[in-house]
């Protein structure tokens, strides 16, 4: 009898938990649909001539260097790995095995603001050496954008970062690197999908199978 009473007492709680889990599941699915719709709009808005120029730059480069800070850095590393798997010579800037850049190489910067200090410093150095600079950013009118040979604009409509004089890590520690709710990672997600699409296009052009 006691067990039956306890079970009856717990029934409303179980019902509430199950209902909450269903609502959370629906919320996640709805958010995925929202992000998919937003990324589709972003993809359609990217200049097709810019894409073609970028793909040509990748195909014609002697070596490809990639870089980014924070989440953008993770996207850059993913792109470098996929390039390597496709037969390109690719490096991540800052790794211990990365050789010096030279004329004829391409450096690809992933930066939402286009103003991250370390990324800008490296881009300017590479440009001075004679390498080509490509920028994946939501802000082409930026420090890196002004020296870039190729620009892919990822239009995210995110609020501007107002403290570009600080390093990404310093802004993060100070709490000045804000999350842009509800789609705070939309630039990185769109950049990742864009870079994967570039790889897929090159694989098709070169008739490479997975």
Language model region names:
Residues 34, 41, 53, 193, ...:
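Alpha-helical scaffold segments in soluble metabolic enzymes
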Residues 65-69, 75-189:
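Glycine-rich phosphate-binding loops that contact phosphosugars or nucleotide phosphates
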Residues 48-49, 53, 204-210:
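Active-site phosphate/pyrophosphate-binding segments
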Residues 43-60:
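A short, well-structured juxtamembrane/interface segment
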Residues 183-197, 201-208:
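An accessory alpha-helical subdomain
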Residues 2-44:
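Generic N-terminal amphipathic, Lys/Arg-enriched alpha-helix
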């Amino acid at each position: 009898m006691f067990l039956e009473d306890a079970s009856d007492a717990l029934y409303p709680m179980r019902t509430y938990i199950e209902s909450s889990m269903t609502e959370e599941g629906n919320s996640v699915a709805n958010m995925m649909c929202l992000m998919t719709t937003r990324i589709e709009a972003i993809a359609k808005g990217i200049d097709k001539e810019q894409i073609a120029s970028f793909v040509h730059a990748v195909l014609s480069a002697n070596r490809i260097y990639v870089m980014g800070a924070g989440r953008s850095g993770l996207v850059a590393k993913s792109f470098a790995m996929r390039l390597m798997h496709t037969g390109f010579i690719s490096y991540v800037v800052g790794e211990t095995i990365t050789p010096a850049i030279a004329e004829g190489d391409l450096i690809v910067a992933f930066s939402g603001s286009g103003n991250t200090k370390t990324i800008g410093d490296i881009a300017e150095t590479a440009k001075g050496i004679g390498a080509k600079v490509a920028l994946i950013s939501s802000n082409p009118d930026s420090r890196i954008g002004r020296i870039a040979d190729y620009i892919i604009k990822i239009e995210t409509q995110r609020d501007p970062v107002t403290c570009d004089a600080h390093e990404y890590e310093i802004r993060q520690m100070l709490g000045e690197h804000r999350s842009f709710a509800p789609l705070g990672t939309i630039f990185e997600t769109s950049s990742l999908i864009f870079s994967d699409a570039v790889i897929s296009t090159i694989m098709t052009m070169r008739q490479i199978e997975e």
